[in-house]
Amino acid sequence: MGIYIFSWPVLREALLKKKDEPGCDFGKHVIPYCHVNGQRLFAYEYNGYWKDVGTLGSYWEANMELIDIIPDFNLYEEIWKIYTNTGCIPPQYISENSVIEKSIICNGTEIYGEVHNSVIGSNVVIGQGAVVRDSIIMQDVVIGENCVIDKSIIAEHVKVGDNVTLGIRS
């Protein structure tokens, strides 16, 4: 596991040569191929936060960790704050009947329903009566009225119609 930086010609060659390798993996196939073929390789030991998010499960877990009371990767850490550039969009709008619990809500989002233990991207609309739990909702998503979204990852630019149920309640 790690972070890899390649020049495009070297990476392209290695991927083409190893494309038929079952379960082709950087650490098991691509890096050894580059080493055997005389490519210059360098390593840097990094002791800060790092998490492999190469699967949907690990991506979901990493996002859920962001909303822990004291996350391993703290978006608000003094020496390493994370900034975003969302352009000129309004702040969040939370209707008076909304319920939000232990979640990250980005700018431009309008919430008319409930959000629990979730990460909500920018410019998202969550309709009246909708309930979002344990989910990641990417930017520019519309979730219709009376929907239930449980333990799901919703890609950007998706519109979920009214009265839809997605995911599995744990």
Cite the ranges covered by each PLM segment.
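Left-handed beta-helix
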Residues: 9, 17-170
